[in-house]
Amino acid sequence: MLTKEQKYFNTSVKWMREATSWDPKGLTRINDFGDSMIMESLALAVDVFWDQLNPKDRSDILNQIQVRANGFYEHWLNYLENRNSSMHVWQHILHRLFLTSVALMDEVPDALNWLEYIYELWLAQHPKMAEEDGAWFNGTGNVGTRPATIRMASNWWAKIS
């Protein structure tokens, strides 16, 4: 990316084509961490290499991402709001869906729905379960994984709101 050397695009497009050949509702969907990493990686790669991708690759990649992102959105909508504890969602999955939403918001209409949901949820509940002193019970291990998400999301919300 930074060097603009063609070899990086060539390698990236091979990986993107491989990932778009996978069934987004199949084995790669079993684990939320793996699924969200595939979604985010494709979203960031398509954003970086947009001008170099041919229309078929763009379409295939966007379709793969949308199936995965809509899967998270539909699964968590009206569920996460009422769930007392689901820290992995807050630490990783919403973070990855957020990055995916930002990367695709000019290309995929659903991305604005994902982004709005995350924004409203973030304002209403973040940090999760910390609205009262002493409410955090998940331990320092979970706290340690959250700073990147907190910094990233807070900075982006300030820029786009």
Predicted regions and their residues:
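Aromatic-lined, polymer-binding surfaces characteristic
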Residues: 1-161
